[in-house]
Amino acid sequence: DNYPFMVLTAYLLDKDLFNGQLLDLLHQEKKLTSRVNVLPDVYSFSKKDFKQYPLNMGHVIFGASEYIKDGLIPLNELIGQSPWQDRMMELLDELHLYIEDFDTLDQYFKKTSSVEEINGEMLQTLSRVFWMTGDQKYLDWALKIADNYLIDTDLSQIEYLKLRDHGCEIIGGLSELYLT
């Protein structure tokens, strides 16, 4: 969670740091952590390899959605077009291949708030990216997620919906989409 604030501070106060070490850090992040095409996974410096084997696609999806929403969206909103925006867009487009279908997430996360957190983060991201790009595919994807919660599912009848802590991301996401 500290990463975007280091980059934003350097962007505002130290262009040499921003264009030097922090840009290098972005390139190293991509080089070391990309595990499923461009999607990142947790890298262990002591092992000089990924932290977990075998691959846990649920963790990869969760981490990528977190990185986009908490790490890259704040940078994009202040800086605009940059290598960080390019990273955000490639991650988002790659995620679409893995989480466009809701049953996919359920196979990784049983009875946890992770599905709501991921979908909420995606709604927040997709709404903002739609405004940034004007590309209808991002709005359509967001609407599909929202329809799942507001039309396809009777939330009063489901066995488990956790809206506290991280699961509440869905509320913010639905709100942002409503304004979009």
For each feature predicted by the language model, list its residue ranges.
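Glycan-recognition and catalytic cores of secretory/periplasmic carbohydrate-active enzymes
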Residues: 1-180
